[in-house]
């Protein structure tokens, strides 16, 4: 048998575990704990994310069947009630803090998306996604009269393709309300925020500019603006107009008294004309249109995590249990992104996810694994050692 530790253990050692233990100590979350520590809880819930486990029973079954693998992780079988209690009682803030500490580690890399830009500014997309919940099971998540929901308000780094801020609220919290709570000082000066027009709040846009950043957002259909003069002659495919404008209504003028730039752009592929407003006057109109197109990246991120992480079905019904599961899902996403970047894995993030799922409890080096293809993984498993179970 190879002396290489199992893949799950290798992934965990990519995490800032010393800081994690400090977070646990701050909350005294392991006080009086005899068996299932916070580290054990993290291990189990990462495993559940990687393998798509839907229930505590599924997890317990795996702990029982693969007991030798779990033993090498320092974990004995855990009763469902023990894990359920841990998810309900251990503060979810521990895992939220771990997410942001891991995010610091991921802050230096970028994806191939950056090559599409001819400018150096950091680019962030701001949006939210709603996760529906059954109100009878999750009464704390009241959204409408007969519907429950929570929202993930997110700032997404388009260059690195990872979220750099997430706020989880109940479904009633409006997008702009949550956005106004973002700490704009944490972003590098000159960051460009691309925002859906549902976030149109001129005081919020002014706050972005006051913090030393820029924004690109679609003009609302009912917005009343005064077209002052042409900013530049239309230049670039699809660019119809490039103008300087100002607001007309008193409240809009009060919230944003400065002039803005209006770029009118026609998308030939979908035969749709868009109007973008921005405070950025230096970039070309084509770049302004390209920036807004990148807003779609956050929609793809939301779609990906809903399809491939366990954030729509939950192992518990308490608020703390749900938030714990979501934060650990986000930690697992960062682990995948970090692994893909560091190993320069040429496949997609989904391919990486599927390969790791197949070998999560096997003693295979991650570096060796990512040099394989899905077809050759089985051969690698055969070389790694004998099967854990035999049918007699």
Model region roles, listed by residue range:
Residues 141:
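A glycine- and small-aliphatic-rich helix-loop capping segment at beta-alpha/alpha-beta transitions
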Residues 66, 70-72:
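Blade-loop segments of beta-propeller domains
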Residues 1-58, 62, 90, 97-101, ...:
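Single, function-defining residue in the core of a domain
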Residues 72-92:
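Major-groove recognition helix of helix-turn-helix-like DNA-binding domains
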């Amino acid at each position: 048998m190879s002396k290489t530790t199992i893949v799950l253990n290798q992934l965990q050692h990519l995490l800032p575990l010393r800081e994690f233990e400090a977070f646990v100590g701050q909350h005294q979350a392991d006080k009086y704990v005899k068996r299932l520590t916070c580290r054990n809880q993290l291990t189990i819930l990462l495993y559940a994310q990687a393998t798509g486990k839907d229930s505590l029973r599924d997890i317990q079954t795996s702990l029982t069947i693969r007991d030798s693998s779990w033993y090498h992780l320092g974990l004995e079988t855990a009763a469902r009630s023990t894990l359920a209690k841990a998810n309900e009682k251990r503060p979810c803030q521990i895992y939220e803090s771990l997410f942001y500490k891991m995010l610091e580690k991921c802050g230096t890399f970028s994806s191939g998306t950056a090559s599409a830009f001819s400018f150096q500014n950091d680019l962030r997309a701001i949006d939210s996604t709603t996760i529906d919940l059954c109100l009878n099971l999750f009464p704390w998540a009241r959204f409408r009269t007969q519907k429950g929901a929570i929202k993930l308000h997110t700032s997404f780094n388009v260059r690195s393709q990872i979220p750099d801020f997430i706020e989880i609220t109940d479904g009633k919290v409006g997008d702009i309300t949550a956005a106004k709570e973002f700490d704009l000082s944490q972003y590098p000066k000159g960051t460009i925020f691309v925002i859906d027009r549902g976030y149109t709040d001129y005081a919020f846009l002014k706050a972005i500019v006051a913090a030393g950043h820029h924004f690109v957002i679609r003009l609302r259909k009912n917005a009343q603006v005064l077209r002052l003069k042409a900013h530049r002659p239309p230049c670039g495919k699809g660019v119809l107009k490039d103008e300087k404008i100002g607001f007309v209504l008193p409240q809009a003028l009060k919230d944003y008294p400065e002039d803005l730039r209006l770029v009118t752009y026609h998308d030939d592929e979908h035969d749709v004309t868009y109007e973008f407003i921005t405070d950025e006057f230096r970039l070309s109109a084509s770049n302004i249109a390209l920036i807004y197109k990148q807003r779609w990246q956050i929609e793809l991120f939301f779609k990906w995590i809903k399809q491939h992480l366990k954030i729509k079905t939950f192992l518990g019904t308490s608020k703390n249990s749900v938030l714990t599961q979501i934060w650990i899902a986000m930690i697992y996403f960062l682990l995948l992104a970090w692994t893909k970047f560091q190993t320069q894995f040429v496949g997609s993030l989904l391919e990486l996810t599927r390969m790791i799922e197949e070998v999560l409890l096997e003693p295979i080096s991650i570096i060796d694994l990512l040099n394989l293809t899905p077809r050759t993984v089985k051969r690698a498993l055969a070389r790694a050692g004998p099967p854990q179970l035999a049918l007699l």
